Amino acid sequence: HLALLLILENQASGRRLRGSARAQDPVVSRVWHKEEVEESESSRGQDFDKRRFWEKDDPTGEHVSVRHEHLEKSHIRFKEDSIDDSGSAGGLNPSKGHLRLKRHDAMEELVSVEDQALANGADPGKSNMQRV
């Protein structure tokens, strides 16, 4: 696990040199690191992820980025589904990708102990929306 973290740090620092302006934004920095975790799981679709999450001019861009952290586990788990769905539209519509992932919220509650703890007994179907 430690080795994986070192690899991620090296990748992240290399990227921040090429995109220092983006890395200065706290939200982008957080998502940037999360994206590294996804790429270590599967390099498939990384260009799609970048297009979706770096559309900073889109009003929903930041909202999608924040949800991305909550949905990190299920996003990796359902990566193929997400790409097949949203990728067909070129991956350029953050809202579509957001809605596609949102459909998996209930499943995420089942597989993630962390999310169950954060929900504090709330309706699992609504807990993610409440935390956004």
Curated annotation (Swiss-Prot):
GO terms for cellular component: extracellular region. Its main location: secreted. Transmembrane segments: none annotated. Residues 1-14 form the signal peptide. Residues 104-132 form a propeptide. The keyword Secreted applies. Residues 33-104, 113-132 are annotated as: Disordered. It is found in: Secreted. Coiled coil: none annotated. Residues 33-81 have a biased composition (Basic and acidic residues). The keyword Secreted applies. Keywords: Cleavage on pair of basic residues, Secreted, Signal. To the SVP-1/-3/-4 precursor, particularly in regions where protein processing must occur. SVP-2 is one of the 4 major secretory proteins, secreted by the guinea pig seminal vesicle epithelium (sve). This is Seminal vesicle protein SVP-2. The lineage of its organism: Eukaryota, Metazoa, Chordata, Craniata, Vertebrata.
